[in-house]
Amino acid sequence: MSGTPDTLFALAAGATRTAAIEGISAAGADPALMAHTPSADAELLTYGHTVRAPVVPVSPSGCPTPAVITRAVRELVGFESLVIDAGLAEPTGAPTVTTGISPGADIRDETPVPDAEAAYSAAYEFGHGLHTDELVIAETIPGGTTTAMGVLAALGEPRIVSSSLPNNPVALKERVVDDALAASGLEQGDLAGEPVAAVRQMGDPVLAVVAGLAAGALDAGIDVTLAGGTQLATAGALVRHDGVTEPMTLATTSFVAGDDSAGIDALAADQDLAVTVTDPAFEARESHPAMAAYLDGEAKEGVGMGGALALAAEAGIGMDSVRNAIISVYDRV
């Protein structure tokens, strides 16, 4: 990562009905409003406040969306950003690049992402046509770690993912993925080497877009950083299963790296991803609600938080300045 003016930050925002399964996600205090989370995150990244979204996303305990952190870093570093509509379920006031993909169905449906191939191709073309030295790719999709587990299962990779919840509901996710495999008539590893099919039958629209975007950019000679945790590592697995071997970096947070249930180091190593971990040292402001919940194990990552923090560090911006900016954005929104 370089953090230069030739760095472009792309946020893929979408939805999956898998998020409606009780106990799966903390991405929104009210399940009825969870579908607005990606749309709100896009607005927060773009404007620093919501525009059309009815709420600022918070967890049931009040943990603010990682978009607050990413926006704070953007205000400090000044990196260029864009939002890709990767299956939004609700409208956003942020300008978006369209891929034509619809919101994903529950992965326990036979074909939760029927338009995966078209979206992958559209994202590939967009990534291949970009003029930038470095592309940092992020995601926002409630329920995305469960769909990531589904894709890993289809590809035959270890089924280990993180969670936005303090206690990762691994057993629940495993049951959902087992049901999804059965619904699609699949066994573990049946779609190894078939990344688009893995997303179509076991994934979500954001994974299709992120993987296509990364593959296109890499084929164009652009450096690619996957900004996130196990979901972005899963996107890396999709790229590898498509036969792309160029170097990629996974930039994540200390919260994901410290989550024993996530196994991020092993997952990244399996996909030949270099790992950058950034610690925002929230302990220094542990009484502030914008940071306390992260220290308690909530959220951990999302909206490219790890990638944004890495860009701040590489720009020589201290984490004390980052924490102050986070408080400023938190108070504003």
Curated annotation (Swiss-Prot):
Gene3D superfamilies: 3.40.50.10210. SUPFAM superfamilies: Nicotinate mononucleotide:5,6-dimethylbenzimidazole phosphoribosyltransferase (CobT). It comes from the Archaea. Disulfide bonds: none annotated. Transmembrane segments: none annotated. GO terms for molecular function: nicotinate-nucleotide-dimethylbenzimidazole phosphoribosyltransferase activity. Belongs to the UPF0284 family. This is UPF0284 protein VNG_1572C. It comes from Halobacterium salinarum (strain ATCC 700922 / JCM 11081 / NRC-1) (Halobacterium halobium). The lineage of its organism: Archaea, Methanobacteriati, Methanobacteriota, Stenosarchaea group, Halobacteria.
